[in-house]
Curated annotation (Swiss-Prot):
Ways its activity is controlled: Membrane attack complex (MAC) assembly is inhibited by CD59, thereby protecting self-cells from damage during complement activation. MAC assembly is also inhibited by clusterin (CLU) chaperones that inhibit polymerization of C9.
Entry's Gene Ontology molecular function annotations: retinol binding
BP-aspect Gene Ontology terms: complement activation, alternative pathway; complement activation, classical pathway; killing of cells of another organism; positive regulation of immune response
InterPro entries: A1-microglobln (IPR002968), C8G (IPR043245), Calycin (IPR012674), Lipocalin_CS (IPR022272), Lipocln_cytosolic_FA-bd_dom (IPR000566)
Keywords on record: Complement alternate pathway, Complement pathway, Cytolysis, Disulfide bond, Immunity, Innate immunity, Membrane, Membrane attack complex, Pyrrolidone carboxylic acid, Retinol-binding, Secreted, Signal, Target cell membrane, Target membrane
Entry protein name: Complement component C8 gamma chain
């Protein structure tokens, strides 16, 4: 049985009519991520494998308060039809945990939907940029809040990749102070059966 709050913590870590017409419902503002274009002809097979989390641009209060406690984070990606099975590995209190999730198909290459497992709502995911061999930039949106993540196949990443990421963060109306860089060591490669959070089956 998971310790109290563990599932929540891990999940926190990887949206008048005119006269004589019927009044119309006010239009919902466009979702921030709806304007982000996915990688052209995104290929999930090439994207598969291991990715290391380098940095996150986000206004998330949790990161603002706990960013100094960030742990090295690894993403393992495996295509599953038109969806992607994603496992996130990170430490919590010195113990390696695995979080299993399914990035569901949306009918658009490079655009995915992670179904909600709690009241905070679904997560929209866009793989916006990648060369498949060295880096990837992903956008995630939940409840209208956008974040930008930079992943790499290996570390360190080039200055040009970092500059490109920082530019995207700025274009997402986030500031330099809202960029959090993750540790470059201490990555988990596996977790035992007692430290697996399966978001797919819950």
């Amino acid at each position: 049985m998971l310790p109290p709050g563990t599932a929540t913590l891990l999940t926190l870590l990887l949206a008048a009519g005119s006269l004589g017409q019927k009044p119309q419902r006010p239009r919902r503002p466009a979702s921030p991520i709806s304007t982000i274009q996915p990688k052209a002809n995104f290929d999930a097979q090439q994207f598969a494998g291991t990715w290391l989390l380098v940095a996150v641009g986000s206004a998330c209060r949790f990161l603002q308060e706990q960013g100094h406690r960030a742990e090295a984070t690894t993403l393992h990606v495996a295509p599953q039809g038109t969806a992607m099975a994603v496992s996130t590995f990170r430490k919590l209190d010195g113990i390696c945990w695995q979080v299993r999730q399914l990035y569901g198909d949306t009918g658009v290459l490079g655009r995915f939907l992670l179904q909600a497992r709690d009241a905070r709502g679904a997560v929209h995911v866009v793989v916006a940029e990648t060369d498949y061999q060295s880096f990837a930039v992903l956008y995630l949106e939940r409840a209208g809040q956008l974040s930008v993540k930079l992943y790499a196949r290996s570390l360190p990443v080039s200055d040009s990749v970092l500059s490109g990421f920082e530019q995207r963060v700025q274009e997402a109306h986030l500031t330099e102070d809202q960029i959090f860089y993750f540790p470059k060591y201490g990555f988990c490669e596996a977790a035992d059966q007692f430290h697996v959070l399966d978001e797919v089956r819950r």
